[in-house]
């Protein structure tokens, strides 16, 4: 069956686009290489390491497509303030929701929570055809648009294709789209830590000579001592830090963060 639109990649971007277009009258298919199943969630679940900072604008989009309630019913951590400073102590800047006459600056949300809420909204409406566990192998352009050949041999056709399949996009590669790439020579260490002090519903970021270190507030069952960290360092330093035991890693992290939260 010829579709009007095929979105390749059911991540946060592809799924949000599918929801935004579901009432346009277009025939839409959303395909992904992984399973398209909503995962069970409990408030006591451990935090996933990958999180996103959702701004007020992102919240409005997710509300309009019907996914926001599914996010907050799972787990979303609002932040009211943001504190940014440099490693030498010569500069800092602060932002606050109060100064912006807003309730919050945004929310820190685990990517899997956003993904499951989007998928839940798609399944509840049923107007977008979902095809999971389907990897793209061939892509051909023809007079009517595009034909996609999947790894199971099935062929899908559409007048328009959206490549939402990530940084290493198969669609982009098969379509021959050129890219300009460079290596920042940095690695990011991401994990969740429980701090001595409350995170104060604030996002914190320190800029060091090696790269930025961010502490993003998380809450689990009312416990506001958790933070998701993103620590950008050189490859060699990342390997050294990852080889440390938990106590030594926490000591190094505390020093790098100037013990702002203990």
Name every feature range the model reports, one short phrase each.
Residues 3-30:
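N-terminal Rossmann-like FAD-binding beta1-loop-alpha1 element of flavoenzymes
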Residues 13, 36, 168:
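Conserved Rossmann-like nucleotide-cofactor binding loop
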Residues 20, 117, 121, 192:
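Rossmann-fold NAD(P)-dependent oxidoreductase module
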Residues 22-49:
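Glycine-rich FAD pyrophosphate-binding loop
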Residues 45-87:
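N-terminal FAD cofactor-binding segment of flavoenzymes
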Residues 74-174, 182-187:
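Conserved N-terminal helical subregion
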Residues 174-175, 187-218:
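Flavin-dependent oxidoreductases
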Residues 209-262:
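Conserved FAD/dinucleotide-binding core of flavoprotein oxidoreductases
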């Amino acid at each position: 069956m010829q579709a009007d639109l095929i979105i390749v990649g059911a991540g946060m971007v592809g799924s949000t686009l599918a929801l935004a277009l579901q009432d346009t009258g277009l025939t839409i298919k959303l395909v992904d290489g992984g399973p398209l199943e909503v995962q069970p969630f409990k408030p006591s679940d451990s935090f996933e390491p990958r999180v996103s900072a959702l701004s007020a604008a992102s919240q409005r989009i997710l509300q309009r497509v019907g996914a926001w309630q599914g996010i907050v019913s799972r787990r979303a951590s609002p932040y009211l303030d943001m504190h940014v400073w440099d490693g030498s102590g010569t500069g800092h800047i602060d932002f606050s929701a109060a100064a912006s006459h807003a309730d919050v600056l945004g929310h820190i949300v685990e990517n899997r929570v956003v993904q499951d809420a989007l998928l839940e909204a798609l399944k509840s409406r049923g107007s977008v055809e979902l095809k999971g566990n389907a990897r793209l192998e061939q892509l051909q352009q023809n007079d009517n648009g595009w034909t996609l050949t999947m790894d199971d041999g099935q062929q899908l056709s559409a007048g328009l294709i959206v490549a939402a399949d990530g940084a290493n996009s198969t669609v982009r590669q098969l379509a021959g789209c050129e890219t300009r790439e460079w290596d920042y020579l940095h690695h990011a260490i991401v994990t969740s830590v429980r701090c001595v002090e409350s995170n104060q519903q604030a996002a914190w970021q320190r800029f060091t000579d090696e790269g930025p270190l961010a502490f993003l507030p998380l809450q689990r069952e009312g416990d506001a001592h958790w933070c998701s960290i993103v620590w950008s360092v050189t490859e060699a330093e990342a390997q050294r830090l990852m080889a440390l035991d938990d106590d030594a890693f926490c000591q190094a992290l505390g020093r790098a963060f100037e013990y702002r939260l203990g």
